[in-house]
From Swiss-Prot:
Pathway recorded for this protein: Cofactor biosynthesis; adenosylcobalamin biosynthesis; cob(II)yrinate a,c-diamide from sirohydrochlorin (anaerobic route): step 8/10
Keyword Methyltransferase recorded: yes
Gene that produces this protein: cbiT
SUPFAM superfamilies on file: S-adenosyl-L-methionine-dependent methyltransferases
HAMAP family xref list: CbiT (MF_00786)
Residues involved in S-adenosyl-L-methionine binding: T20, G44, S45, G46, T47, G48, E68, A96
Protein name in the entry: Probable cobalt-precorrin-6B C(15)-methyltransferase (decarboxylating)
Keyword S-adenosyl-L-methionine appears in the UniProt entry: yes
GO biological process: anaerobic cobalamin biosynthetic process; methylation
Organism: Sulfolobus acidocaldarius (strain ATCC 33909 / DSM 639 / JCM 8929 / NBRC 15157 / NCIMB 11770)
Entry's EC annotation: 2.1.1.196
Amino acid sequence: MRVPGIPDEEFIREEKIPMTKEEIRVLALSKARLFYGAKFLDVGSGTGSVSVEAGLIVGEKGKVYAVERDPQAVELTRKNVEKFSLRNVEIIEGEAPEVLNKINDELDSAFIGGTERLEEIIPVVSEKIRRGGMIVLDAILIESAVKALHTLSELGYKAEVIEVIVAKGMKTSKGYAMISRNPIFIIYGEKK
């Protein structure tokens, strides 16, 4: 079984396309409760880092749908999917929630990485999630976290939130200094 935690440096990157960092991916995917054979949706795939990690976890019997509206990010997701030799990731170019109608599978879990239009995207994603499935989101802004919590709660999810502050060690001439990254909210809930 594959566990998440691919080092960030292993992904092909482009300066203006955001990437969910390694430690946040690990926590978010654990909250998604992925398993071999699962069907998973990544809304706002960016670099494709979450889609790649998920694709490795769900394996050849599983399926990952990577949704992205930015053509450059779509291409970057494609490059990373190819780099990791994944055949179980389907990339869907377009705006969520509109393009989500292209997904006919019942999903086990979903990750929403973009924070625009949450009140529109979350209900459409929820319709595709099986009972007992998970929706996970990450957000930098408190307002986005509150919108996500409120929307999940309105849909009957037991919504929860954690704030994650990661500091990575950087070697200096005298030892290691801890360099802090941006705090991130991870919001998640199980469909009842």
